[in-house]
Amino acid sequence: MVESQKAMPQPKMGRIHRIHFVGIGGVGMCGIAEVLLNLGYEVSGSDLKVSPVTQRLESFGAEIFVGHRAENAAHADVLVVSSAINPANPEVATALERRIPVVPRAEMLAELMRYRHGVAVAGTHGKTTTTSLLASVFAAGGLDPTFVIGGRLTAAGTNAQLGTSRYLIAEADESDASFLHLQPMVAVVTNIDADHMATYEGDFNKLKKTFVEFLHNLPFYGLAVMCLDDPVVREILPQVKRPTVTYGFCEEADIRAINVSQKGMQTHFTVLRRDREPLEVSVNMPGNHNVLNALATIAIATDEGISDEAIVQGLSGFQGVGRRFQVYGELPVEGGSVMLVDDYGHHPTEVAAVIKAVRGGWPSRRLVIVYQPHRYSRTRDLYDDFVQVLGDANVLLLMEVYPAGEEPIPGADSRQLCHSIRQRGKLDPIYIERGAELAPLVKPLLRAGDILLCQGAGDVGGLAPQLMKSPLFAGAKQEKSK
């Protein structure tokens, strides 16, 4: 049965009163900071610039510093850092000199989870959407979960929230193997793909073993929820010595989807569960990859005793996550308009899934992609895959690689990608010079009825709102909030 609402014992971290976040504006950091603020801790943080995220935290009482300086950390009882922070950072150096503990963000998340019934969502792709769906369904089921998500949940207007129930739903980050800090009661593995391989010394077997180790952080009475459609997840399944539930499209899955149909943004399917009546479900998200995300959610909600009615309501009422196939609106062009979509996908598997979703939901429309590769190392490691999947667009514009702190790698840049895609003979990509304005470049290429997709994890994320405001697209119609 679903638990009733009750006051949740809050974590007490002994002598810790003031918590300082180095890089507080980061998507993985700000959510934890917001939860800690709501728990009554003093929170400070530094970042390189003011942003809506830092302004939001400041409005909740956080002290925000612009720039990294030693004095920012002077009064902290603990520093929280992400893997993106250089160990030579002056705030980190000061903390170490003064014997102030410096902990990774995942360790702080683990501390919050230690006092709760933790649900941790891991996997190379789909973490943010699955975590968000879980938050929506748990809320619909009468629970009030705490959640920490790697994207802005549209309905809540934030990526984190302190709830009153015993549940904490959070993403588990494999990029730096920090998810090994977490000790959840329930863990999801959506898929395992080659990404962040520097963390695993280029050894895919090491990556797989780390996922198994993560699942063994579950207690013997916990639950591992695993996608049977993913070949690598299927491969590691026999090694997992914890209770498991599988999901997918395949017949062997404990929870599976059949009769999938998609029209535009809406996807409908039937869910089969062992010893349960079939469940008819609709989600306002395109693509089979989102069906899988919904199945993981249904598996956990069913196990936690949430009613079928609440599951259906939570999924159908889900309003999406920022930059996960986010429809911004319609851009006017000669003879009609173009649907403008923003998406965070930055791995070939994610790009392919979105292209497939567009082809399934809007089969008669052209797809124009503005893509920005993220990191030179990822571009190098997955070069052939990028060439193949990006070549499936109808029109392709490539921005220069977003370095994310990396130095350029010869042959792993967007000019070379353009050349390789052009050699395939399917289309002629357009290279966008760094700093060039997009609107004058893209407008002549658009036709009425097109879908314009701005995709990637770098500063490409700012293009969609810029296009909506561009004088060249005067009269653009903003997508209405659901």
From Swiss-Prot:
Residues given in the record as ATP binding sites: G123, T124, H125, G126, K127, T128, T129
One GO term (biological process): peptidoglycan biosynthetic process
Cellular localization per UniProt: Cytoplasm
Group of enzyme by EC: ligase
Pfam families in the cross-refs: Mur_ligase, Mur_ligase_C, Mur_ligase_M
Primary location class: cytoplasm
Matches recorded under InterPro entries: Mur-like_cat_sf (IPR036565), Mur_ligase_C (IPR004101), Mur_ligase_C_dom_sf (IPR036615), Mur_ligase_cen (IPR013221), Mur_ligase_N (IPR000713), MurCDEF_pg_biosynth (IPR050061), UDP-N-AcMur_Ala_ligase_MurC (IPR005758)
GO cellular component, one term: cytoplasm
Alphabetic keyword roster: ATP-binding, Cell cycle, Cell division, Cell shape, Cell wall biogenesis/degradation, Cytoplasm, Ligase, Nucleotide-binding, Peptidoglycan synthesis
GO molecular function, one term: ATP binding
Reactions listed under catalytic activity: UDP-N-acetyl-alpha-D-muramate + L-alanine + ATP = UDP-N-acetyl-alpha-D-muramoyl-L-alanine + ADP + phosphate + H(+)
Parts forming coiled coils: none
EC number: 6.3.2.8
Pathway the protein contributes to: Cell wall biogenesis; peptidoglycan biosynthesis
Family as reported in the entry's similarity comment: Belongs to the MurCDEF family.
Biological role: Cell wall formation.
Protein's UniProt name: UDP-N-acetylmuramate--L-alanine ligase
Species assigned in the record: Pseudomonas putida (strain W619)
